[in-house]
């Protein structure tokens, strides 16, 4: 994921994209295209404040995000954009590649890929729920 992102930002540098606001703008376009949400909306959906969004994606979300960024990199190399608007178009097209994959997976599984679960909430959901009896047994063992 880190290497794919670095390849993408290297391409943006080569194609006249300025770090900071322009990178964030293109990243939002990619997220909006494949996940249907901007970075800010995605973080809000997951209940994140300062946490890193990528660190709180499911494996499916991470893979689709990587596909979106890899596709954007490939399209950028092929089209050689020179303006921010041309780079925005490449970002949208790259994100759309992952959107098609997401929609196909959702149609095959019958469930949404973009999840409100953060890493913390995901791991909490994976833990077996303790029954009232288990809690009572724990208290007995503590005595």
Predicted regions located by residue number:
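Positively charged, phosphate-engaging catalytic surfaces used for nucleic-acid and nucleotide handling
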Residues: 1-143
